[in-house]
């Protein structure tokens, strides 16, 4: 594979020296960009974008053509795995993701197949290899998957949920069924991420979007334990380089020490944590990624710059920090403000890497 021209993202994840703090944004290829909206219109709908490697490559690269980002992230969706299990993913306008079928009983879960990463999700692997080829070493490519608990909530609820009542009822009423579902999902996610790594992903992130909805005891047993299982099963070196693993639980600020203990390289933080305190709590065990509140991007560029400066100062000197938002960038953000955010990080962080 082509040598990397900019590897500061991978270096920061592995706590190696960098010249400036690297940055990428969750959902950086998304609806806030007019070029993304044009591609989505050409593709017809969201799933056609995901399932066509050329379209997926095109939208993955769009933010990199516009901004000096330090990493690309595969354009896909966390729900590709339940879709490949036969649940029939579709998107309702204004409603978000839905499934034609849901799982509610032990029998439903026993009947679920574990998807073959190459055969059933080959379009994702094709997208990864296409993007790597097109990137030509500009920046590293991040692969990703949803966490077992997060995927399970969509499969049981049939879509997004405000209170996760069906998933939590299953967790407490029928823990055997929930554990079987989570175990199947952990096996599926492990194979899926390893497939992405073999296809060319140079780092991977596990998105535990809904782990923060659980009680502490339930989080440890039904979310964290399965992410640990995945991390233990991942390919950690490929193409002569380490493949760093990032784990991100939104709302996981109470459990940073436990999350830092599962063997991942990097801990993703949402905006409710102070990054300096997080650094003290986890010590040198993991690097940190985050964590500006994405809604700060609706403020003026000077205010964005101030908040970037505050977070950089809170983290302090040295490597081990990848700057990001505390969750995905939202559709109404002005692309110029995203640019101001990225430029501020590179301009203001050099002093911390002398």
Curated annotation (Swiss-Prot):
Instruction: Offer an example of a GO molecular function term for this protein.
Output: uroporphyrinogen decarboxylase activity
> What organism is recorded for this protein?
Pseudomonas savastanoi pv. phaseolicola (strain 1448A / Race 6)
What's the protein here called? Uroporphyrinogen decarboxylase
* Family matches, as Pfam families: URO-D (PF01208)
State whether it acts alone or in a complex, and with which partners, per the record: Homodimer.
Q: What is its main location?
A: cytoplasm
| Pathway where this protein functions | Porphyrin-containing compound metabolism; protoporphyrin-IX biosynthesis; coproporphyrinogen-III from 5-aminolevulinate: step 4/4
Would the keyword Cytoplasm turn up in this protein's UniProt record?
A: yes
UniProt family annotation: Belongs to the uroporphyrinogen decarboxylase family.
Site (Transition state stabilizer) at: 77
The cross-references to NCBIfam families, in alphabetical order and at most eight, read: hemE
Report the EC number(s), separated by commas if there are several.
Answer: 4.1.1.37
Q: Does the keyword Cytoplasm apply?
A: yes
**Any one Gene Ontology cellular component term annotated for this protein:** cytosol
InterPro entries linked: UROD/MetE-like_sf, Uroporphyrinogen_deCO2ase_HemE, Uroporphyrinogen_deCOase
Report the subcellular localization.
Answer: Cytoplasm
Q: Which enzyme class?
A: lyase
Q: Which residues are recorded as binding substrate? A: 27-31, 77, 154, 209, 327
Instruction: Report keywords, A-Z.
Output: Cytoplasm, Decarboxylase, Lyase, Porphyrin biosynthesis
């Amino acid at each position: 594979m082509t040598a990397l021209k900019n590897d500061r993202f991978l270096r920061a994840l592995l706590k190696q020296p960098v010249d400036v703090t690297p940055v990428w944004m969750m959902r950086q290829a998304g609806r806030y960009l007019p070029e993304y909206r044009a591609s989505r219109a050409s593709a017809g709908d969201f799933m056609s974008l995901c399932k066509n490697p050329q379209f997926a490559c095109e939208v993955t690269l769009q933010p990199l053509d516009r901004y000096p980002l330090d990493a690309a992230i595969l354009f896909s969706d966390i729900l590709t795995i339940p879709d490949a299990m036969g649940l029939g993913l579709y998107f309702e306008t204004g409603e978000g993701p839905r499934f034609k079928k849901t799982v509610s009983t032990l029998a439903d879960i026993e009947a679920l197949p574990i998807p073959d990463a190459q055969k059933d999700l080959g379009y994702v692997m094709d997208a990864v290899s296409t993007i790597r080829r097109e990137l030509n070493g500009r920046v590293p490519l991040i692969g990703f998957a949803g966490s077992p608990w997060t995927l399970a909530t969509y499969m049981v609820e049939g879509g997004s949920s405000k209170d996760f009542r069906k998933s939590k009822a299953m967790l407490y009423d029928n823990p055997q069924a929930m554990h079987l579902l989570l175990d199947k999902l952990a096996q599926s996610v492990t194979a899926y991420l390893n497939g992405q790594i073999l296809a060319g992903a140079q780092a991977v992130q596990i998105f535990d979007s809904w782990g923060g909805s659980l009680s502490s005891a339930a989080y440890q047993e039904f979310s964290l334990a399965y992410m640990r299982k995945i991390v233990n099963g991942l390919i950690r070196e490929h193409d002569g380089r380490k493949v760093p693993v990032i784990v991100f639980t939104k709302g996981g600020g109470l459990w940073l020490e436990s999350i830092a203990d599962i063997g991942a390289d990097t801990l993703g933080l949402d905006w409710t944590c102070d990054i300096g305190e997080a650094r003290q709590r986890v010590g040198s065990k993991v690097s940190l990624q985050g964590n500006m509140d994405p809604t700060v991007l609706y403020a003026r560029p000077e205010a964005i710059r101030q908040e970037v400066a505050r977070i950089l100062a809170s983290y302090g000197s040295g490597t081990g920090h990848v700057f990001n938002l505390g969750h995905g960038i939202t559709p109404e953000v002005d692309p110029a403000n995203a640019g101001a955010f990225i430029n501020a990080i590179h301009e203001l962080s050099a002093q911390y890497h002398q």
